[in-house]
């Protein structure tokens, strides 16, 4: 059986990227919380 994680940069950006996060209210909350927490990286 093959492993389930087969990394692809395009999918990574499309699914977890900044623009995708900004599209939904929940995603904006994620960005906001990560800013407040002081994360170096906000999104993938």
UniProtKB/Swiss-Prot annotation:
Record field: compositional bias (Basic residues): 1-23, 30-44
Domain of life: Bacteria
Keyword tRNA-binding applies: no
One Pfam family named in its UniProt record: Ribosomal_L34
Ranges for region Disordered: 1-44
Gene3D superfamilies the record matches: 1.10.287.3980
One cellular component term from this protein's GO annotations in UniProt: ribosome
HAMAP family the UniProt entry points to: Ribosomal_bL34
Protein name: Large ribosomal subunit protein bL34
């Amino acid at each position: 059986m093959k492993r389930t994680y087969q990394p692809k940069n395009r999918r990574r950006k499309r699914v977890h990227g900044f623009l995708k996060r900004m599209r939904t209210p929940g995603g904006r909350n994620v960005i906001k919380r990560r800013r407040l927490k002081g994360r170096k990286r906000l999104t993938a």
